[in-house]
Amino acid sequence: GYVTDILTDQAIKFIQQPRDKPFLLYIAHKALHPNVVQRDDGRVVNIGEGDFVPAPRHEGLYESEVYNRRPNNGIAPLDKPALMQKIDSLPPLGPETATKEKTIRERAEMLMAVDEGLGKMMQELERLKLLDNTIIVFTSDHGYWYGEHGLNEERRLAYEEAIRIPLLVRYPPKVQQGSKPDNMVLSIDLAPTLVQLAGEALTDKFQGRSLVPIFENSVENWRSSILIEYYSDTVFKKMKSMGY
């Protein structure tokens, strides 16, 4: 079967289980990643380099689609500090290494199974009369480059395209439908948000901040800056060359 559909089916089976207390369902789809297998020794191997496989029913769905690139497409950041110019393990930008339109289309087609899966889970919650009493959070771990800054098929530098990701929250008792706040939020804000929405008291052990005041339009003194760090060897090498 198609792994996105399998994960969706397992999630729905979990939702259907009889229970007398609230539940937490966390589902992390592998869709948008290339076609890989895990060997018995734990190694993860690409079985088709750059091979992005949509569900059979979605193959060719966007075959004629052309995705507009951003104005900074193909412009290498040579005026930036060495830390921001490239990832050492990646080849330089060029006709052979640039992200192809086919790759972008196939990844968009892969997303269709994710979209359908979320819809099926919401339909099941509605059938069980749980939908409006369930907090639904949809987000990602990072963005991607498709030629922006002269960088391709990566995300390990702190550019806007890599660090600014979707965060969608549905919870009618607290979140106004159609609202689009522009506050700067982080993934570490999710834990205190869910704890507060569940009716529990917050402690100073949380690194993040609850988003409930944003939902209620009562936020004060929200953050205006963030620190981005990553464990990539590239970063450490460049910092060392800068005297750190």
Residue positions per predicted region:
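Active-site-proximal cap/lid insertion segments
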Residues: Y2-I6, I12-K21, Y26-V185, L197-K205
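C-terminal cap/loop subdomain of S1 sulfatases and analogous C-terminal strand-loop tails that border
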Residues: P22, H142-E148, I188-A191, Q196-Y244
